[in-house]
Amino acid sequence: MKKVITLLALMAAAQIYAQGQECINLSENECHRNSSCVPVNFKKCCGDQQFACYEGDFNSCHYITKCYKSSKSLDVIESTNECYIPPAGYELFEPVSSCTNDELKHCSDQGKQCIFKRNDCPNPTSCCPGHGVCEDFNRSESGSGNKEQISTTGNTGPQTRGFTISGTGGTGSVPIDACTNVLCQQGEHCEVDQDGRAHCYVNIESIGTLPLGCLNVVCQPHQHCEIDKESGLAHCVLDINPIGFTTIDASSTVAGSSSTTGGSGGTGSNDICSNVHCPDNYHCEMRQDGKAQCVADINAIGFTTSGASTNGLIPPASTGWSDVCSNVICPPGYYCQKNEQTGKADCLNYSSSTTGGGTGSTTGSIDVCSNVICPPYFHCEKNDKGWAQCAADINAIGFSTSSTNGLVSTTGSNDVCQNVHCPQFFKCEKNENGLGECVSTLIPL
């Protein structure tokens, strides 16, 4: 028996090692389709986008921008996933978007001012926005476009992926022709980037009301961004009282109190869900056959979209697309469309697109799952609201319900399992607490 256990352990270790080696050798498309592998994008300063594939999943490998600098060549690499493994000799560092204190002092000692010159290249990165140079005071008054920034204070810290927070020194003059037809979202303003293109930036005064980690997060309707206190990561959670859905904190002793944590019991338009308790990151919905079903929350932790510039979302075939959008870069999760009433460019949220008229009208169809990467044992489906949703595979080996969060109960019938829908290979049984529980029908190995 011991030999059998040892042999099984060796086979498992060999399989894990083989999976890791397999990920490294996969193409980008193959890596996206393999649930055991994580696709990672990275690039050097002003370089082209590159790709690598590592073993892991999106529960442990989160999208986050990190900057690495070589101690020998001073080369810089920007990666967008925390599981990226840099080459030997590369270390983490924080870039600056204004003159450093040393550069300010150096220029001041020469009787000059420090000008932060942004890198002039086709593919700039937030890890190497530019550098400080010393120039005479009267030279900057003639202006040199938006690629120069006069600094009178220390550095303003690194840029956030998808957004740029302008410092107190500003980012230079804004040409009128680039921002004239740009209408930014609330809390943003239009500026011109180093390529002369209009860009919507977060207002500096908005920082006090929005966590920094949420600045590059676009949530679905009826959700908002919060920072997890334990991990420090940003994630989308349900609003306390979205239309037609109310979450209930079962542990609260105050009547009518609510909570936005996962695993909530949903009430509102569907009475059948009033006493159904779903696992974390799931909510209750009534199926067409009248049964209650726990459905994965949109954009739950572990649900990610690929791509760097637009979070992997593809702009729909829109009406009114014209030259007013040619110089507009919208924030991640948004696309540009001409407003027929004002003639200006609107940055619209992908999730707000409808099939009717108006500013957000669209034609054609969108494959909402085309760039969605789901966790292991999950697949992407288009739900009845038209959103991409990661749904559990009904026949995935290893998929099971939690002993505590997998409990469901119903009212209106003596049979607690009458309106409970379990995955394939699971059946509903009444447990010792009198609640319906989804129990596996498979025989353990």
Swiss-Prot record:
Chain ranges of the DSCP-N domain: 21-139
Location of region: Disordered: 141-161
GO annotation, cellular component aspect: spore wall
InterPro entries for this protein: Dict_spore_N, Fol_N
Signal sequence interval, chain numbering: 1-20
This protein's UniProt keywords: Repeat, Signal, Sporulation
Polar residues composition-biased segments: 141-159
Domain annotation Follistatin-like: ranges: 178-201, 213-237, 272-295, 324-348, 368-391, 416-439
Record's note on what induces expression: By cAMP and the MADS-box protein srfA.
GO annotation, biological process: sporulation resulting in formation of a cellular spore
Function: May contribute to the structure of the coat at the interface between the middle, cellulosic layer and the outer, electron-dense, proteinaceous layer.
Protein name: Probable spore coat protein sigD
Organism: Dictyostelium discoideum
